[in-house]
């Protein structure tokens, strides 16, 4: 192949490499690990630790095996609430060993008929894996298409980054779901509480016009959040 004909391929390869690097949810680590020191209010020690995108690093000389261990997913969380669900999140804030590693994991417990309400993760793609029970998982694309699947034990569903989605227990027994993310802090935007429970509030007129409903309905919805 001539030098002239290979030039476009080199340019394309370079462009793809740059694009791939920009699509990574979290920055690539530049060290083996950076166990998080999660800053607390007035914590001068945390402020003195070396910083990296995410949380400050615990001094390597003080890192121990337990920093890379998390037992929280082994225990079911309380689902006795109006939605019938609860989440145990293992992210860089709750599981310091994940800091800078670009991954996190969680456990969703759903009572019969319980729902993990509509929400999105602005910084991560999500894998939904059902450990027990039967769960309807679904998301809506930017084109307004609704994609969903009823998952049984051992089955998995993927939700693209930023898409609004949910998990709903359609079985007659409690369900357990493991969720995995390609970000140490995926973030969560809950649709209901964001729109109707923000502080300060979104004006009723804006919401009523946006949803084409009476302001009384907006006030009713706000009373729920």
UniProtKB/Swiss-Prot annotation:
CDD domains: cupin_OxOx. SMART domains: Cupin_1. The keyword Isomerase does not apply. It is found in: Secreted, Extracellular space, Apoplast. Residues 1-25 form the signal peptide. Oligomer (believed to be a pentamer but probably hexamer). Belongs to the germin family. This is Germin-like protein 3-8.
